[in-house]
Amino acid sequence: MAVLSLVELCFISIMERMEYNNQALQKIPPQLIERLINFMVYKLPPNHLSLQTISKPIRIKLVRQNRVITMRFSIYNTIDKIIHQIYERIINEEKMEQNEKQKNSSNNNLLSLLTLNNNNQNNNSSIITTTTTTTNNNNNSNCGSSSSSSSSKQILWGSIENYGLFQQSGSFRNARWLQLDKTLAYYEIDSNETLEFKTCKSVLKIRFFGPWERVVHPLHQSTMLDETIKTFVFDESKTVSEISMELAKKLQLKYPEELSLKVQCEEEDDGRGIWLSADLTLPEQGIDPLYTIFLLKRQFFFCKDIIIDFSMDAEMLHFVFCQCLDAIIDTSHPCSPTESILFAALQCQICFGDYVHGSKEIDQIRQRDFLPMEFINQKNILKEILIQYQRLIGMSEQKAKLNYIQLAKSLKTYGYTFFKVTNRQTSIVNNNLSSSGGSGNGSGSGNGSSSSSSNSSSGNNNNHNHHNHQQLFGISSEAVLTLDPMTNNTISLYSLSNIRKWHVLNNVFTIEYNDRKDTFISMEAEAISHVLSSYIHHNLRETPSIQKQWDQNYLSVSGRNSLTNGRKRLSTCSNCSSDSMEFDSSKSNTKDKDWKYQYGLVIKKCALYIEPKKLYINPLSTQITGSMVNKELNKDTKVTKVLKVLTDLSSKMILSFSKSSPAKEREIVVKFSDKKVKSFVVDEQKTVSEITQEIGLKLGIKNPEEFSLQLIVNNKNNNNNNNSNNSSTSSSSSSSVNNSGIFDGLNNSNVNNVFYNSYIVNSSISNNSNSNSNSNILNNSNDEQSTSTSTSSSLGGIWLKPYQPLSEQSISPDSKLLFKKKFYTSDIGAADDCNSDPVYFNLLFFQSKDAIISNTYTCSKEEAIQLAATLFQINFGDHNPNIHKPGFLKSQDLKFFLPPNSLELWGLSFQKIEKSIYKEHQNLRGIKEVYAKYRYVQLCRSLKTFGAIFFSVRQLLPNKTNGSSSSSSNNNGGNSNNGINGNGIITGGNGGSGGGGSGIGGNGSGINTGGNGFGGSQQIPINQPLVLGFSRKCILFMTAKTKKFLVEYPLTHLRRWAYHKDTQCLTLDFGDYEMGRIVLQTTESEEISSYLSDYIDYIQTKLVGSQSFSRSIFNSDNNSSSFFSNSFCNNTTTTTTTTTTTTTTTTTTTTNNV
């Protein structure tokens, strides 16, 4: 207690004197930081620590028994613990079944004995004694059999170590095995998803060629064996590197760390195959081992210092010979035709001995066992092999093997691991280059340009002759080699110390040297990065002087010499976001820099963004500058992460010690989704989020943070306001919109494109903006369409800002607020069980019903009929054929059960719809009201649009222009322009296959964005009414009229977004993903940005924050090193922007005109 009190006093004094400055906090020793955080978590436990008791039902499929069970687990249990719980339940259930069977069999035996007693009345005494003894014997046998059956059941299921949990593939990922050390909260598992409990053991088929067979069977060294396929039992949940190590140990091969697995490509005939990613499992790479044949090959050449002479052991000599022979035949070491003839002649001498004229063995040899695949069909090559074979008469087998190995080592390709690549782009790295056009995400490269009256920026790509054709990219422990596969001529050769960095994006591998940069396309991009990182890591371990210099550079730049003892050794190749990496300030990203200086543009970053471009820094590089080391190493250090947490916790400490100001109470009227209205007295100085949680706790809701408040908008007041706005127009044109939102065509005034947003839950207030230039006008609705908005205003309103006090949001005393569920995460909470939280469940049911009836949650005809029949069961009970018959419903009654305009959309008559509802209603006989509501909610959960909130948008047309901007596309030669009064966001050309440029200009500033273009947005129609929705995991695009799904993108692909009030534009930036940037026109741009910020902040607080501040992480028994590594390395490395505050996760930047 004395230490804690001392730490408390020190921390309070630090906060008072340093004014909570990060630079001052960096001077705190790491040991004191650890004690401070442990103390603060102990004294001030965050609210989310109570979430550790949250349990979640999971459906488990027992593959062995082919049945599905449902079990409830804590979301903070590890997968290993969950597997043990499932295994124990299975064993216990089978024990109970076995005991019941034994009990029934013993009862049957007693009944048979009793019947014998009745038949033999003359011998009662003897029969009774025998009966009792028999019964005792049966009981004894039952006890023995029960113990043996329990052990037999465990033997039948096998060891628990052989089982795991398997998750099938989803929308944006492959199938995977759940890792044992991860928690259930780490994985996003929906309530309707089923996990498979099955054995991890599977069958792996490895194809071995002749040389490898001779290594396995050394007795058959005199003859060549045909290629065979061997089957091994392996653990499917292990990575490829672990599998290859186990296989090498089973085969008793030397140097198992040099081996890896390949997959034979069906499209190629050269036998080269494709290297698998070593750090992933087979299911994560989309490979089914039951239907795939693998190759076990040598991938690394770490051990090259073997002395090749006659003193070698015979087994070692044969092993090295087989490795060289295998590499020559499968073209892992490319060679010329002359060299291949010499190799084949030496191989004949080893296999057949001295040359004998007219030997049948030589005439019947298969050329593919002696020659690479590319030389088999050459003319007269067999005659040339025989000529060289005759010259080797008298050479022993050992001498021939030595010559074969020496000849293989003399090749310039020996020791290299080669990959087949396509060179897409080669550029010269020049210090005077201003900005270079980026390459598109597709197969082409793009040059983007944008110009304006003040500034101009252009992008150029300096391409060389060696691009857009096949090449061989080789990596060794010393250098990187690029060859022409036809002639084996050297294209480029660089040592590893001349490599500055490289990054991987999908199947694109880009490597940057000191004087040039190459971009390749390859199916083995991840394997190339892995081999290069492994060689650098190996060299770094072998040369500790380089590691020491690397650490000194880090310490000299960071200036934290006091943290040397508590810091672990840095990894050789660190992974980070490409945006934060700058080797030189003159080569900064001009696109992002100029985007920030547009007048009136608000930019926000998405903290959930996962960078697809994996950027690696080479510590062996001799050109490391101080700025690079500072940018790279200070980004993800453990101390920086600790300081971020410390800053957040210090603010919580300040709030706890500060005196609260006197409350200003006021009464608010709150309406709920079940149509009930209640009054609450709240403190208007508190934020909306705090008030919402207070209301939720008063109602008895366990998860009040998922709810928020909306301001109910009155239709009549809005119409009056809009009419008054129209009467008092300004000198320039203004843009305004009311709740119904008739959207006139952008840059297309001749065409009357009109759509309604009557199904939009959150209608926006009229947003008037005046500008000096001509702007697009969104007209008010006519009286004809005013009826279509009655449902929208009754269902929802305007979301209040959650982190602002209630007094600052201009809420009139007579206004009504709507208490609604706003956030839908991965089904964690009490909604899965209608009995655990009835208030929460009841509100969720009514909100889901309103969303279905208002067509917010779009569904098919079959789904809508099931939902309508369930509502029938809730309202009218079981089906009664005397009452529920044609004529019971009227056509106007369908609006209470089905979405609007359902008859026109499906092309059915009222009688057919009514008959279908009655037919489905009959199947629900006997279901009580509460379970019918639960069924209704579960049906809604299965919809793709469940939990989504939609907004009316249009994608901008990239053909017409009003501003002065230009862009060019290099793929198809097409040019396209688009501008919005010179102030907005100007999109670039479409480009052919992922290429194309895009420009952004505003107020005389133009920039170049390279080849982002509109790669993925081509699936979205341009200048047509669309619906943009944000669901639990995805960003949805739908057509406004037919509600047809167009495309969906995961939230983790959204890098950032920006909106412009004057031009009413919203830009979704997907970073390096194929979608690029999507520019939308909407009157609700600010509302969309606010909602998206709140949603991402909630996800960060709920999921990421709960793991960052868990008591299991801040364990006082752990050491300092494990404390730093466990608490901050899990979730922060995959996000672009990491913030730990519970109030503002996203970063907002508002800049003025430069």
Swiss-Prot record:
Coiled-coil positions: none
Pfam family, any one: IRS
Induction section of the entry: By starvation.
The FERM domain, residue ranges: 218-547, 666-1103
Region listing for Disordered, in residue ranges: 122-149, 432-468, 715-734, 771-794, 961-980
UniProt record, GO biological process: actin cytoskeleton organization; cell motility; cell-cell adhesion; negative regulation of cell-cell adhesion; negative regulation of cell-substrate adhesion; positive phototaxis; response to cadmium ion; sorocarp morphogenesis
Record-linked InterPro entries: Band_41_domain (IPR019749), FERM/acyl-CoA-bd_prot_sf (IPR014352), FERM_2 (IPR035963), FERM_central (IPR019748), FERM_CS (IPR019747), FERM_domain (IPR000299), FERM_f0 (IPR032425), IRS_PTB (IPR002404)
Gene3D superfamilies noted in UniProt: 1.20.80.10, Phosphatidylinositol 3-kinase Catalytic Subunit, Chain A, domain 1, Pleckstrin-homology domain (PH domain)/Phosphotyrosine-binding domain (PTB)
Disruption phenotype: Loss of FrmA leads to increased cell-cell adhesion and results in impaired multi-cellular development, slug migration and fruiting bodies. Mutants show increased adhesion because of an increased number, persistence and mislocalization of paxillin rich cell-substrate adhesions, which is associated with decreased motility. FrmA null cells are unable to efficiently sort to the apex of mounds and form the organising center known as the tip. They also show a delayed expression of LagC.
Ranges of compositional bias, category Low complexity: 448-463
Keyword terms: Repeat
A GO CC annotation given for this chain: plasma membrane
SMART domains, A to Z: B41, IRS
Gly residues composition bias: residue spans: 437-447
Entry-linked PROSITE patterns: FERM_1, FERM_3
Function per UniProt: Key regulator of adhesion dynamics, it acts as an anti-adhesive. Plays a critical role in the regulation of cell-cell adhesion, multi-cellular development and, in particular, the formation of the organising center known as the tip. Required for turnover of paxillin-adhesion sites during cell migration. Plays a major role in normal cell shape, cell-substrate adhesion and actin cytoskeleton organization.
Name this polypeptide is given: FERM domain-containing protein A
Gene that this polypeptide is encoded by: frmA
